[in-house]
């Protein structure tokens, strides 16, 4: 991780891809930028994303191979240049792309003399090979060569205890990690109180997905990891609070919604997410539990609808409307939630 001083200024938080290239079928590279971040935030985001990219993204691998009656993995088969162990190592390197779940079967069945590559693997419809030229074995003589394979989708790195097989079936240490490497750099910008940080993130993948796809999946995994905290029910609500919550004045947002639609600045209501309103976490969580994600969702509700949301109170309604008045550059009607 590198820190450098650079000059620059960014007004709103945004991310973008500043470089993308394909070095080979099994090596993709992407460079991304996120800014502006307050001091310390770049490190927090960089560490979390790096861990998620390397350990939380699923990949598809060959996890087992069955050769027939072969006593151990160091055995050789007549007419084949490689030992069983070398073939297993070659199978381990095969890069697959799929969205399958569970275990799937695949196979190789060819006749020599010839080179066997990844292209010779007979796969289920949901799986494809990233690089069909990857070598597996070299048949020097006119012999039949058949292998039964197992394919699985998982994450991280799995090893299995090896022992002499009775039926010629051997596990393959699978690396379910489509992201090969991740680096991040932090750059400081601005002066005095205006100082902020810019995060640069570099991602290398094995070709089964692009760096942009990997970044998206890692971000989703991090969000899912914190969702249980957002769904935690508030404890200790008093009887008076519950009573007040059940007896609100039943006004609607309809006039306000109409006013917003007539807004000259043309605010896309379905593109404004409630997390952009900077609501308190308790109010925000109430709305999210009710599947209210955008300003369009919110303004389509009546006050009666909102008051039916678990833990939603009159104070929340007034706070929401005050927030809209504060952040939206439009003239809003004066009627609000009354306390």
From Swiss-Prot:
NCBIfam families: rpoA (TIGR02027). GO terms for molecular function: DNA binding; DNA-directed RNA polymerase activity; protein dimerization activity. It holds the Pfam family RNA_pol_A_bac. It catalyses: RNA(n) + a ribonucleoside 5'-triphosphate = RNA(n+1) + diphosphate. Belongs to the RNA polymerase alpha chain family. Residues 264-339 are annotated as: Alpha C-terminal domain (alpha-CTD). InterPro entries: DNA-dir_RNA_pol_insert (IPR011262), DNA-dir_RNA_pol_RpoA/D/Rpb3 (IPR011263), DNA-dir_RpoA (IPR011773), RBP11-like (IPR036603), RNAP_asu_C (IPR011260), RNApol_insert_sf (IPR036643). It is an enzyme of class 2 (transferase). CDD domains: RNAP_alpha_NTD. Residues 1-233 are annotated as: Alpha N-terminal domain (alpha-NTD). The N-terminal domain is essential for RNAP assembly and basal transcription, whereas the C-terminal domain is involved in interaction with transcriptional regulators and with upstream promoter elements. It comes from Zea mays. In plastids the minimal PEP RNA polymerase catalytic core is composed of four subunits: alpha, beta, beta', and beta''. When a (nuclear-encoded) sigma factor is associated with the core the holoenzyme is formed, which can initiate transcription. DNA-dependent RNA polymerase catalyzes the transcription of DNA into RNA using the four ribonucleoside triphosphates as substrates. It comes from the Eukaryota. GO terms for biological process: DNA-templated transcription. This is DNA-directed RNA polymerase subunit alpha. It is found in: Plastid, Chloroplast. HAMAP family: RNApol_bact_RpoA. Keywords: Chloroplast, DNA-directed RNA polymerase, Nucleotidyltransferase, Plastid, Transcription, Transferase. Its main location: plastid. SMART domains: RPOLD.
């Amino acid at each position: 991780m590198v820190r450098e001083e650079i000059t620059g200024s960014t007004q709103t938080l945004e991310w973008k891809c500043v470089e993308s290239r394909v070095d080979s079928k099994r090596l993709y590279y992407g460079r991304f930028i996120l800014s502006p971040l307050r001091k310390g935030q770049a490190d927090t985001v960089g560490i979390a994303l790096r861990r998620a990219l390397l350990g939380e993204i699923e990949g598809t691998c060959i996890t087992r191979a069955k050769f027939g009656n072969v006593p151990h993995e160091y055995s050789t088969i007549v007419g084949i240049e490689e030992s069983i162990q070398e073939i297993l190592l070659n199978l381990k390197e095969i890069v697959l792309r799929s969205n399958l779940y569970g275990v799937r079967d695949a196979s190789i069945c060819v006749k020599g003399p010839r080179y066997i590559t990844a292209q010779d693997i007979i796969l289920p419809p949901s799986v494809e090979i990233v690089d069909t030229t990857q070598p597996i074995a070299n048949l020097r003589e006119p012999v039949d060569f058949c292998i039964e394979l197992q394919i699985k989708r998982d994450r991280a790195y799995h090893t299995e205890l090896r022992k002499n097989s009775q039926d010629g079936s051997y596990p393959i240490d699978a690396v379910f990690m489509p992201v090969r490497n991740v680096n991040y750099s932090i750059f400081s910008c601005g002066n005095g109180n205006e100082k902020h940080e810019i995060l640069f993130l570099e991602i290398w993948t094995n070709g089964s997905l692009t760096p942009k796809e990997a970044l998206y999946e890692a971000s989703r995994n991090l969000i899912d990891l914190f969702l249980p905290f957002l769904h935690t029910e508030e404890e200790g609500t008093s009887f008076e609070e519950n009573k007040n919550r059940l007896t609100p004045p039943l006004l609607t947002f309809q006039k306000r919604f109409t006013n917003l639609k007539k807004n000259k600045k043309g605010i896309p209501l379905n593109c404004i997410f409630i997390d952009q309103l900077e609501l308190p976490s308790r109010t925000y969580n109430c709305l999210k539990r009710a599947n209210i994600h955008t300003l369009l969702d919110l303004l389509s509700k009546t006050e009666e609808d909102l008051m039916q949301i678990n833990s939603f109170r009159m104070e929340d309604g007034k706070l929401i409307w005050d927030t809209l008045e504060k952040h939206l550059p439009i003239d809003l009607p004066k009627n609000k939630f009354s306390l």
